[in-house]
Structure formats: C-alpha cells, structure tokens
C-alpha cells in the first residue's frame, strides 16, 4: 500500500479529514493539516481503528450516554449550586446598582421619572458614600458629577473640588465627557470601561442569539481576485459553464453578481464582484462576506502590483487564500517563478513546507478546475463554516440598481437564517417587504438559506453595495427602524457637510459664485472684540468674504458652539478659553475652535485659509532645454535618450515636451533621469544625461526636450 494524503484517505473511507487528524494525534503521529502524508504503517493502524469502530461504536455510545447523561447533569447541577448562588447574588447587586443609578440619573435630569412628590429628594438618598473604591466603573455616553461621585463612593463636593483644580466649573447634575471621567477616576486609581449602548437604529439590538445545536454546515462564499488580464473572468466563466449550466438544464443563467455551483452534493457560492474596489468597499461598510479568496496569478506573467494589492486585502480581511496558477498551457508558463515570487509576500506553497494551497490550471481549457473546486471544499471543511437556517435572515447586499420595470432591485447574500417571500426587511437605510425572489439561474424561489445569493424586489429605495440587511418580525417594526436609519444617515450627511474647519477649507464645496467664512468671535474685553471684528472684515481676498455672525465678551460657551454648529462657522477665541461644556459640545458637533493671544496671528491664519479656499491659478515656467545627441534601445525599458542640457536644468519631476523641427510631437513626464549610472534628481546646463520618457519611445537624434514646471500664482 502506497502513502496517502489525509484528505485522500478520508475520502476513501467516507470520514471527515478532522476525524482522521484527531485519530492520528491519538496514535502520537503528528500531522499539520489535511494535505499531510500518512505512512503505510499508520494507514494500517487507521484501517484497524475505523473498521473496529464502524459497527459497535454507535451502540456503545448510545448505551453509555443514555445512562450517564442524567447523572452527569444532576452532578453538575449539585456541584455548581453554591458558587452560582454567590454569583447570582453579585450579579443581582450589580444589576440593582446599575438600575438605581439609571433611575437616579433620570431623576437628576427631570426627564422621565416624574412619579410624585412622596419620593425622597435625590440629595437625601443618593449620595451615601461607600467605604471601598471599586476597581472599575462603567461609562456609557456621559456621566453626571453626582453619578460619578456615587460610583466612586465619594461626596459630590469632593468631585467638584477636583474638577475645579482641573479648571472645570461643574454642578452636581452636569454631564462629564469620557476624558474628564477618566481623569477623575485616575486620581483614585480606578479604571474606566466604556460600555457601548446599541441605539434603536442598530441591527445588534434586534439580533437573535444562535444556539450551538441549531448551527448547520453552510456552503463557502468564494471571491476571485488578481491582476488585470490574469484570467479572473475567464476562470469564473469556465466554472460557470462546466458546473452551473450542466447542472441547471433549461435554466437561464443571468448575471446577479453571485452564483452557486454544486459538486458531489456540496454547494459553493462564487461572488462575481468587479475586482478589489467592491471587495474593499464592502469591508469598509463592515461586511465580512468572503470565506475563501482565490488569488489568480498568470504563470507566464508572475506577481504584479494588483496581485500584491489583492494579497493585502485578503490578509486584512483574515481570509484563507488559495492560489490558482493560471495559463499553465502557455509555452512561456513558469509556475515555479510564481511560487518563488509569492513566497516573498508570505504565501509559501505546501510543497515547500508552507500552508498555502497552489492549484495549477488553465481557465481556457478547463484543466485543473475540478481540483480547484475540491480544494475549496477541503478548506471550507477545515474552516467549519456554520449558520442557523431556522432563524430570521440577515446578510449583505452584493449589488443594487433601479430597474424601470421592477423598481428597486437588490442582490442579497443570505449569511444566516432563511429569507422568505413576504418577509418584512430592512436593507441598509431602506425597508420593505420581499415581493419576489429570483435565484442565480433566473428561477423564482420562495426561500433562500445561508450562503445563497438571490435578487429581491419590494424595497422603497435602492440600497448600497455592502449594506447589511435584517428580517424583522413585523412590517411595522421594519418600517420604523428603516425610517429611523434613513433619518440618522441624513442627519450625519448634513452634519458632515456643515462642519467647517480651517484645515479642510480647500476641499469645501462651492456655494454658487460667493464663498464666505462664517465666524463667531469671542474676546476678553469689548475693545478687543471690535478691533478683531474690524480687522477680519478688512481682509480683501478676491471671491471670498468674512461674515461675522456673532461677537461677545467672555469665555466661549456651549451656546456659542451650538450657534457655530448651526451656522457652519468657526469659533475664534482671543485671550479666552472654552469651558468644559463648550469643549465637549464642540467635539460632539465637530466645531473648529481657534484660540489666539495676538491679533495679527488671527488675521494671518484666516487670510491664509481664505486664499487656499480660492481655486488656485497656475502659470507655466520653462526651466531647461535638452538636445538629444544619441539614442539607445533597451528591451523592457524602451528608448533611452542621451542628451546634453543646453539651457537651465531638467528635473526628474518636471513635465517635458518633445520638439522635432519646431513642432511639439509629445507632451508627458520624465520616467528615468540618470547621469552616468546614477539616478539623479536634476541635471544642470553643460552636463550630459540619460532620459527615458514615460510611455513614449519614438525619440530621435536632433530632437529637443523642453522641461517645464507649473507654478501656483500667489494671490495678493
């Protein structure tokens, strides 16, 4: 009997690779993964083990577990009863404390707990100091001075004194931000843990927890990535042609951005996404869609820039990579070179002692496709991909568009649960009821389980690719959550557009022909306010004007920040500081505060920002001329011009024009600039140099190269 790989032996005796690996480890035989080789003597031992356990194992197990399970459970209950009491007691205490704190906060803020006059006042009951300091306190969105005092077991007056020493004037009911709470807590050596509270609009609030026993194995979701022209599309088409069409007789294949194939009763979902941009966009929106990445590398071309980019994307998403070495049927194919180059990027082939699976194939002829699919199934088995089909569906949008006949159409990938026709659904910031579902071969279906791509209609608007979706119990809840999410997004967009700072004035959107900066000016005395306002309004920059919407004497207050936020303004403070509330509000509202002590520095800063706000004007300046005296043709580089600088200088980052007989025949950029064998940044008049022009090779002796730069005209 010859040696066999783990997965081959597992396949032969119809047992999973994981069971074989576990059995080998029990026999003290070390194996790393399903691709490891098994020696002959080990195969014999495995044969004996699995043949012996084939029939009687089930009966023994049943007999054993049948009698023992109730006893074990009873023992566990008896053993764990005492500690659980203590734990439950502690939990109840913590919950009671938190509940009391919440009630007390509500009483302090006079918002919700208006139950009557018989209650004791908060000051009488709330602030009984505790003896011991806690190790850790929890912080949600904010915490009042009184609540912080109670958490720390201190008198509120003590906390207020400490805040005064930090320059923060606060009352007992005033809310503190996280930084301030951490500062005060650190004074007592107490840690602050931030607790994230899910809002009504967040899907996490409506998530159903899955029990381990409800989870079932689901098909893997595979994305194919790689460099342009390395055969991604051909590979997808080849898999679709050999597996989808033959398996779906009479089915009309339509493009919905994803499709499924079936091999030996097991399904695989392929995402037909347009390259890395869509992959990255989905990840940026929090959509971890892909389970396995197929990295396509052409055997005749090797690793290219987009290949490296694809590797980095897959690694950042922590997704296993299978390398498909394509175009092996070409005469110039060199798979070993591909392996060598990928090793430099951390993808070491199994044949060389690594963990990355390499599959040589030809997408054009179909050679190696079956082996690739087998490897995908093996990796998915090792990854243990599971989902619960008996719950309300959740997943991700793959594609979405507005169809003239159907309205809003979205391709969804169900990641957990089962989606049914008629389900009330929220998709991103849109909502609706699933009116119709079409699978990847154009057939109408009534339900779709985990890892299944379907095209649905029935949404009120078009969602974005990468948006999450969740099915709700009723249409009323779905509508309210969908509308709330849409409103929240609109507010965020307005907030993002409205907030102006001096740093990002260059990127601000033009509002008609007039551009203006709104300012709120605060100073220590009225004279300074008037002088500063007058000086700012005298700034004369073409096309931009200063609009002072509010002036005042004294510290920058919360009302100043709210006004600035509503008016898209920048706050200027002269010899004054913002108070604690103003700081926290400015951070929350993203309002830019600029503090100065010298008037001319305020003027200079605003003037510079206003100049940057204008569209820059440029003029061309010729910096040098080069005469081409000789040309050299080099393979893989192109034509090198041996030149002599007749005027000025030529630099590596300058623009160039190639002039022949007084006519400009090409305008572009310098690719390489050398003096002898060294790369140089510039070459001056009277020196020789070697030049290559980016994406242009028709250079002849006698040509003139004119070097120029674009200079920004300074506004006056």
Curated annotation (Swiss-Prot):
InterPro entries: EF-G-like_DII (IPR053905), IF2_II (IPR044145), IF2_N (IPR006847), P-loop_NTPase (IPR027417), Small_GTP-bd (IPR005225), T_Tr_GTP-bd_dom (IPR000795), TF_IF2_bacterial-like (IPR000178), TIF_IF2 (IPR015760)
Annotated stretches, region: G1: 226-233
Annotated stretches, region: G3: 272-275
Example of a GO MF term: GTP binding
Record key words, sorted: Cytoplasm, GTP-binding, Initiation factor, Nucleotide-binding, Protein biosynthesis
Location of the region described as Disordered in the Swiss-Prot/TrEMBL record: 50-137
Gene3D superfamilies: 1.10.10.2480, P-loop containing nucleotide triphosphate hydrolases, Translation factors, Translation initiation factor IF- 2, domain 3
Gene Ontology CC terms: cytosol
Source organism, top-level taxon: Bacteria
Domain tr-type G: 217-386
Amino acid composition bias (Basic residues), ranges on this chain: 102-118
Role played: One of the essential components for the initiation of protein synthesis. Protects formylmethionyl-tRNA from spontaneous hydrolysis and promotes its binding to the 30S ribosomal subunits. Also involved in the hydrolysis of GTP during the formation of the 70S ribosomal complex.
Record family assignment: Belongs to the TRAFAC class translation factor GTPase superfamily. Classic translation factor GTPase family. IF-2 subfamily.
Protein name: Translation initiation factor IF-2
Organism this protein belongs to: Bacillus licheniformis (strain ATCC 14580 / DSM 13 / JCM 2505 / CCUG 7422 / NBRC 12200 / NCIMB 9375 / NCTC 10341 / NRRL NRS-1264 / Gibson 46)
Lineage of producing organism: Bacteria, Bacillati, Bacillota, Bacilli, Bacillales
Gene name, Swiss-Prot/TrEMBL: infB
